[in-house]
Design a protein with these regions (language model features):
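Acidic/aromatic-lined carbohydrate-recognition and catalytic surfaces
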Residues: 1-189
Length: 189
């Protein structure tokens, strides 16, 4: 996250990491050690420590580069310019400035929501469906937790009692009522 490029959104992302890996390999490096990229809380302030994840099974979507998602190129002109405008809100002229994960995630999540609304090509839809099947119930449960965290806060103890059972009728109802938002959280993975 500290290694940034001119295309970054305020902190380094997976594309910056790939570039660093390529450069490191060209310099003779056999491996590159990174901090964990685990999923963080979806609400409130983003925890700066990668050692306090909300899940070790899923990744933090803050490391996605929105412009490299295939559907980004199908945005209309207005939404594409909005995504670029959101990116500029994350930039800091001072390379020594502290990373602002909250500012980056606020902007990036809005951009990702715009991109998620674009219809996928048939092959991308098939790949996403295959991914969902492969990741199974854990992915759906994690995405449901993300949604419930957005609605009720990240501590499930504070949720209405009927939402404490992830396989109960109330959670099943929420999954149906908010299927699009749950799909978004699965898509982020």
């Amino acid at each position: 996250y500290l290694v940034r490029s001119h295309h970054s959104w305020g902190l380094g992302d997976l594309t910056d990491l790939a570039d660093l890996c390529t450069w490191s390999a060209s310099q003779g490096a056999g491996y590159l050690l990174t901090n964990p990229l685990h999923a963080a809380e979806v609400t409130g302030r983003m925890e700066p420590s990668p050692y306090l994840p909300s899940s070790r099974l899923f990744v933090n979507p803050i490391y996605i580069r929105p412009e490299l998602i295939a559907e980004y190129h199908d945005l209309d002109q207005y939404d594409a310019s909005l995504v670029e405008s959101l990116r500029t809100t994350t930039l800091d002229d001072d390379p020594q400035a502290l990373l602002d994960r909250d500012r980056t995630w606020q902007a990036k999540s809005q951009a990702l929501e715009l991109i998620h609304r674009v219809d996928m090509s048939a092959s991308r839809r098939m790949a996403f469906t295959a991914f969902r099947v492969a990741r199974g119930r854990r992915l759906e449960d994690f995405a449901t937790w993300c949604l419930l965290s957005e609605l009720h806060g990240s501590d499930w103890h504070d949720w209405p009692a009927e939402l404490h059972d992830p396989h109960g009728a109330a959670v099943a109802r929420v999954r149906c009522e908010h299927a699009d938002r749950i799909d978004f959280h699965m898509w982020l993975q």
